[in-house]
Amino acid sequence: MKKRLIWLLPVLVGFLVFVLFQTVFLLGYVPSESMEPTLREGSMILGTRIYRELNNGDIVVFEHNGELFVKRIAAGPGEEINVEGKTYHVPPNAYFVLGDNSENSFDSRYWENPYVSEDKIIAKIVIPS
């Protein structure tokens, strides 16, 4: 009986960790310098896939045109934001995102559709390293 438990416990723990990272948490890294100095390129981040709400200032991981991005929410649904002399009106269920390193960030300012749909947000960052 003890021999069975010796190998069963690590398998169960490994399975539980796998399930948690597929459903609740996101462990990743920052792919570029667009979020510096807040998040350094290559630094590890921990996000949660389960959150109550998103607010301006939150850092999120999202999918845009088949790529994953890490950016900060600058404006939320129904808000208006003026960036570099241009006014944006954020539609319902969408967000306007910017990188902290504005000179080195490919973000909402440059996209044909500058808004990130709520359903494209994968996680809210809770622990940057």
Question: How should each PLM-predicted stretch be described?
Answer:
Residues 1-129:
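Extended hydrophobic leader/signal-anchor segments used for secretion and membrane insertion
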